Amino acid sequence: MLKIVKKLSILLVVCMVVSVLGSITAFADYPIFYQRYTADPSGLEANGRLYLYCSHDVYDPNNPNYIMNDITCISTDDMKNWTDHGEVFKASGWANYAWAPVVVARNNKYYMYFGNNATGIGVAVSDSPSGPFKDALGKALVNGSTPGVNPPSGFWCFDPGAFVDDDGQAYLYFGGNGEGNTRVIKLNGDMISINGTASKIVGPIFFEDSWIHKYNGKYYYSYSTNWSKGAPTIDYMISDSPMTGFNYKGTVLPQPPSNGNNNHHSIFTYKGNWYISYHNRELVRSRGITDNNAITYQRNVCIDRLYYNTDGTMQMATITADGLTQLKNVNPYITNEAETMAQESGINTEECSEGSRDVNNIENGDWVKIRGVDFGTGAVSFDARVASATNGGNIELRLDSATGKLVGTCAVQGTGGWQTWTTKSCNVSGATGVHDLYLKFTGGGGNLFNLNWWKFKTAPTEIIYGDLDGSGDVNAIDFSLLKKYLLGSISNFPSPNGLKAADLDSNGKIDVLDFVLMKKYLLGMITEFPAGK
């Protein structure tokens, strides 16, 4: 794969503010993912994470067109740092394309619906939200021959939107290229077969991009408009029924900046908040690419907060470049996958022999940014899982920018192969509090090394045996806590080191012997515990 141009724009475009009566500002992030060009995102909350499933734009200057043959999945638990799960589904067999996916969860499985260009919709299934997904039928689930579709001339059978209602009934929405070209059909409980015939939904100036969601008992059908009123927007309708009776309500997402074309969106919740995801073409522009075809056919996904008015209508989103709040800080003292990042320059990712993915294609000057890392009182060392078929290089640990404060440098030597892994360590000084962390890679020419994961370490803390509440003293409160633990009333102690501090005889478990030792200490029968000697 050709190396992506590395220089990123320092400043992303701050975009237009759209004012509508009764609306408030909603904030977006773009781009949120840099390793590949992606579009048509659909969101799913699963296992405490938000997953986005995206079309993957591959540009061929000899064939300027939308080339999308696989699906990229990314996920986050903080809305700033995104894990790259790679291409989780690849078109094959009957399907030559994989366009605009949607994923829903049911039966302890995950079902992906995708367009084979505009000729039909397939379904793939996985046991995990991060894939891999496998084609479930080896043929289209719906196409122009499906009962009730009755495709008029120019009908596009693509852009699926799937939805499982509260009563367990599932629906599939699809279609494109005309106001009367939306179709909805029921799915059976197996999610890979249809039930009955398709019905028509008519959306004013509908073009493509069907999406359905439910809010306060109402059904919201949203879609991309055509060019008849200017630049396409995301408009929506509301109904009391998932298949009929929709009433047009207006625009929820204006034409994004740096787009200049139609759009594709999804609306979903994560941790109680509503979001809308879509795409524009900011990433390719920020890299200084001027080829109009490359700009047209290489998109990037974005995400935005979404709000409702008291009457149930949706407020129009106002798009900004960096508006979302990071939901939690990154813990640097646990193993962090290298493919989880907020931004990068120059690198790629690939499947890793140790599982998951690794960062590869690392050359001199490349970097990875991790947003909002909480170093607390300070890190003293850094570990990195690396592999190199060459002479390696260095990982510079910098704060807040790629040229920011240097807090450590980890030297990486050759390991004999790009998947021959070893752990390298280095000392760290000056990393305290919350910062953006930059892993900056330096060395000679060509590819330097691959990176699987990283982790910081703190200085060892002194254990005060018997101090279970973290007060710095051993007293009756600690005795009471130990009693509660042994009775099963509590499963941990207020002190972060409480479980270790309660093992007073250092036999590897907390039991009645520790209780006796604590009692003797408080009665003055002993002055120290065996574990402290």
Set out the residue ranges of the language-model regions:
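Cellulosome-associated attachment modules in secreted, modular CAZymes
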Residues: 19-26, 461-533
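Sec-dependent N-terminal signal peptides of Gram-positive bacterial secreted proteins and lipoproteins
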Residues: 4-26
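Carbohydrate-active catalytic/glycan-binding domains of CAZyme proteins
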Residues: 27-408, 413-461
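Hydrophobic alpha-helical segments, especially transmembrane helices
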Residues: 7-8, 52, 484, 520
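Exposed boundary/loop context
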Residues: 15, 339, 348, 463-465, ...
